[in-house]
Design a protein with these regions (language model features):
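Phosphate/nucleotide-binding beta-alpha loop and adjacent structural elements of enzyme active sites
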Residues: 1-201
Length: 201
Protein backbone atom coordinates (compact mmCIF):
# COMPACT_ATOMS: atom_id res chain seq x y z
CA UNK A 1 0.00 0.00 0.00
CA UNK A 2 3.01 2.28 0.35
CA UNK A 3 3.00 3.19 -3.34
CA UNK A 4 -0.60 4.42 -3.09
CA UNK A 5 0.38 6.72 -0.25
CA UNK A 6 3.23 8.09 -2.33
CA UNK A 7 0.80 8.97 -5.10
CA UNK A 8 -1.52 10.67 -2.62
CA UNK A 9 1.30 12.94 -1.49
CA UNK A 10 1.58 14.41 -4.98
CA UNK A 11 4.69 15.32 -6.98
CA UNK A 12 6.88 16.32 -4.04
CA UNK A 13 4.37 18.91 -2.87
CA UNK A 14 2.25 18.99 0.27
CA UNK A 15 0.41 21.84 1.96
CA UNK A 16 2.56 24.97 2.14
CA UNK A 17 5.45 23.16 0.48
CA UNK A 18 4.39 23.86 -3.08
CA UNK A 19 5.83 25.25 -6.28
CA UNK A 20 5.05 28.83 -7.21
CA UNK A 21 5.72 30.78 -10.38
CA UNK A 22 9.12 32.41 -10.24
CA UNK A 23 10.56 30.03 -7.64
CA UNK A 24 14.22 29.08 -7.87
CA UNK A 25 14.21 25.30 -7.48
CA UNK A 26 16.99 22.84 -6.72
CA UNK A 27 16.07 19.36 -7.99
CA UNK A 28 18.56 17.09 -6.23
CA UNK A 29 18.61 13.68 -7.86
CA UNK A 30 16.92 14.92 -11.01
CA UNK A 31 17.23 11.59 -12.85
CA UNK A 32 15.10 11.85 -16.02
CA UNK A 33 13.89 15.29 -15.00
CA UNK A 34 10.24 14.58 -14.27
CA UNK A 35 10.07 16.91 -11.28
CA UNK A 36 12.22 19.45 -13.11
CA UNK A 37 9.70 19.44 -15.95
CA UNK A 38 6.80 19.96 -13.54
CA UNK A 39 8.60 22.87 -11.87
CA UNK A 40 9.49 24.31 -15.26
CA UNK A 41 5.85 24.32 -16.31
CA UNK A 42 5.03 26.26 -13.14
CA UNK A 43 7.38 28.96 -14.40
CA UNK A 44 10.20 28.13 -11.99
CA UNK A 45 13.92 28.43 -12.67
CA UNK A 46 15.28 24.91 -12.10
CA UNK A 47 18.78 23.70 -11.30
CA UNK A 48 18.70 19.95 -11.95
CA UNK A 49 21.45 18.12 -10.04
CA UNK A 50 22.30 14.69 -11.46
CA UNK A 51 25.49 12.77 -10.73
CA UNK A 52 25.43 10.18 -13.53
CA UNK A 53 26.56 11.39 -16.99
CA UNK A 54 24.76 8.55 -18.81
CA UNK A 55 21.45 9.61 -17.28
CA UNK A 56 22.09 13.21 -18.26
CA UNK A 57 23.01 12.29 -21.84
CA UNK A 58 20.17 9.83 -22.41
CA UNK A 59 17.32 11.42 -20.47
CA UNK A 60 17.80 14.64 -18.51
CA UNK A 61 19.31 16.64 -21.37
CA UNK A 62 16.24 15.90 -23.48
CA UNK A 63 13.95 17.13 -20.71
CA UNK A 64 16.03 20.28 -20.35
CA UNK A 65 15.98 20.90 -24.10
CA UNK A 66 12.18 20.83 -24.07
CA UNK A 67 12.02 23.27 -21.16
CA UNK A 68 14.11 26.41 -21.49
CA UNK A 69 14.36 27.17 -17.78
CA UNK A 70 16.16 23.99 -16.63
CA UNK A 71 19.90 24.15 -16.03
CA UNK A 72 21.73 20.84 -15.54
CA UNK A 73 24.37 20.57 -12.81
CA UNK A 74 26.46 17.39 -13.17
CA UNK A 75 27.30 16.99 -9.49
CA UNK A 76 26.56 14.68 -6.62
CA UNK A 77 25.07 16.79 -3.82
CA UNK A 78 27.11 16.25 -0.66
CA UNK A 79 28.42 17.82 2.56
CA UNK A 80 31.84 18.68 1.14
CA UNK A 81 33.50 19.28 -2.21
CA UNK A 82 35.32 16.14 -3.27
CA UNK A 83 35.22 13.28 -5.78
CA UNK A 84 32.93 10.36 -4.92
CA UNK A 85 32.99 6.82 -6.28
CA UNK A 86 29.56 5.88 -7.62
CA UNK A 87 27.92 2.68 -8.76
CA UNK A 88 25.61 3.25 -11.72
CA UNK A 89 23.01 0.50 -11.96
CA UNK A 90 22.87 -0.57 -15.60
CA UNK A 91 19.41 -2.15 -15.31
CA UNK A 92 17.79 0.37 -12.95
CA UNK A 93 17.83 4.07 -13.76
CA UNK A 94 16.84 5.13 -10.25
CA UNK A 95 19.24 3.20 -8.01
CA UNK A 96 22.68 4.66 -8.65
CA UNK A 97 24.42 5.77 -5.49
CA UNK A 98 27.67 6.60 -3.77
CA UNK A 99 29.59 3.35 -3.17
CA UNK A 100 29.72 3.59 0.61
CA UNK A 101 25.91 3.93 0.72
CA UNK A 102 25.26 0.78 -1.30
CA UNK A 103 23.30 -2.07 0.24
CA UNK A 104 23.74 -5.77 -0.53
CA UNK A 105 20.91 -5.87 -3.07
CA UNK A 106 22.41 -3.03 -5.07
CA UNK A 107 25.89 -4.55 -4.75
CA UNK A 108 24.73 -7.72 -6.53
CA UNK A 109 23.27 -5.91 -9.54
CA UNK A 110 25.06 -5.11 -12.78
CA UNK A 111 26.79 -1.81 -12.32
CA UNK A 112 29.39 0.54 -13.72
CA UNK A 113 31.80 2.33 -11.42
CA UNK A 114 32.62 5.97 -11.99
CA UNK A 115 34.10 8.97 -10.21
CA UNK A 116 31.69 11.87 -9.76
CA UNK A 117 32.40 15.44 -8.60
CA UNK A 118 30.50 16.36 -5.45
CA UNK A 119 29.48 19.83 -4.29
CA UNK A 120 27.57 21.36 -1.40
CA UNK A 121 24.48 23.39 -2.20
CA UNK A 122 25.93 26.28 -0.20
CA UNK A 123 29.06 26.23 -2.38
CA UNK A 124 27.00 25.98 -5.57
CA UNK A 125 24.97 29.03 -4.56
CA UNK A 126 28.11 31.01 -3.81
CA UNK A 127 29.94 30.05 -6.99
CA UNK A 128 26.96 30.84 -9.22
CA UNK A 129 25.79 34.05 -7.55
CA UNK A 130 22.33 32.66 -6.80
CA UNK A 131 20.43 35.19 -4.69
CA UNK A 132 17.87 32.82 -3.20
CA UNK A 133 16.65 29.22 -3.23
CA UNK A 134 12.89 28.82 -2.82
CA UNK A 135 12.39 25.05 -3.07
CA UNK A 136 14.65 22.03 -2.60
CA UNK A 137 13.51 18.57 -3.68
CA UNK A 138 15.82 15.70 -2.76
CA UNK A 139 15.69 12.01 -3.67
CA UNK A 140 19.35 10.98 -3.67
CA UNK A 141 19.47 7.39 -2.48
CA UNK A 142 20.51 7.84 1.13
CA UNK A 143 22.65 10.97 0.76
CA UNK A 144 19.88 13.35 1.81
CA UNK A 145 21.45 13.99 5.21
CA UNK A 146 24.72 14.93 3.53
CA UNK A 147 22.85 17.31 1.25
CA UNK A 148 21.22 19.00 4.26
CA UNK A 149 24.54 19.36 6.08
CA UNK A 150 25.94 21.06 2.99
CA UNK A 151 22.98 23.45 2.80
CA UNK A 152 23.01 24.94 6.31
CA UNK A 153 23.54 28.48 5.06
CA UNK A 154 20.67 28.11 2.58
CA UNK A 155 18.35 26.81 5.29
CA UNK A 156 19.33 29.62 7.65
CA UNK A 157 19.30 32.54 5.20
CA UNK A 158 16.78 31.52 2.53
CA UNK A 159 14.45 29.21 4.53
CA UNK A 160 13.81 27.17 1.38
CA UNK A 161 10.76 24.93 1.19
CA UNK A 162 11.94 21.33 1.53
CA UNK A 163 10.59 18.10 0.07
CA UNK A 164 12.89 15.23 1.01
CA UNK A 165 12.53 11.46 0.63
CA UNK A 166 12.82 9.65 3.97
CA UNK A 167 12.72 5.97 3.01
CA UNK A 168 16.36 5.22 2.22
CA UNK A 169 17.76 4.84 5.75
CA UNK A 170 15.82 3.84 8.90
CA UNK A 171 16.75 6.94 10.90
CA UNK A 172 16.27 9.44 8.06
CA UNK A 173 13.30 11.31 9.61
CA UNK A 174 15.01 11.84 12.95
CA UNK A 175 18.36 12.85 11.44
CA UNK A 176 16.78 15.21 8.90
CA UNK A 177 14.68 16.91 11.56
CA UNK A 178 17.73 17.51 13.75
CA UNK A 179 19.81 18.97 10.92
CA UNK A 180 17.00 21.22 9.65
CA UNK A 181 16.05 22.63 13.05
CA UNK A 182 19.66 23.11 14.05
CA UNK A 183 20.19 25.22 10.93
CA UNK A 184 16.91 27.13 11.31
CA UNK A 185 14.61 26.55 14.33
CA UNK A 186 11.76 28.39 12.58
CA UNK A 187 11.05 25.46 10.25
CA UNK A 188 7.73 23.66 10.58
CA UNK A 189 8.08 20.00 9.60
CA UNK A 190 5.50 17.47 8.46
CA UNK A 191 6.37 13.79 8.06
CA UNK A 192 4.29 11.74 5.64
CA UNK A 193 4.59 8.19 4.37
CA UNK A 194 7.88 8.47 2.52
CA UNK A 195 8.73 12.15 2.48
CA UNK A 196 9.40 15.03 4.83
CA UNK A 197 8.04 18.47 4.04
CA UNK A 198 9.35 21.58 5.76
CA UNK A 199 8.77 25.31 5.45
CA UNK A 200 9.13 28.52 7.43
CA UNK A 201 5.81 30.38 7.77
Amino acid sequence: MKHVSNVNEGPYEYGEVCLKEGDIVFDCGANRGLFSAVASRYGCQVFAFEAIPDIIDNYLSKTANMNGNIRIANFAVWDKEETLNFSHMLDHIGASRCDHLRDEIVARKKRKHLAVPAITLDAFVGKNGIERVDFIKSDIEGAERNMLRGARKILKEFASKLSICTYHLPDDPQVFREIILDANPKYQIVEKFSKMYAHVP
